[in-house]
Amino acid sequence: RGSXLTILPLRNISD
């Protein structure tokens, strides 16, 4: 279910 897709934007916002 969007493994990456969800982790990609999530990490960007965390930074």
Curated annotation (Swiss-Prot):
One of its GO terms (cellular component) is extracellular region. It is an enzyme of class 3 (hydrolase). It comes from the Eukaryota. One of its GO terms (molecular function) is aspartic-type endopeptidase activity. One of its GO terms (biological process) is proteolysis. Expressed in chorionic epithelium (trophectoderm). This is Pregnancy-associated glycoprotein 63J.
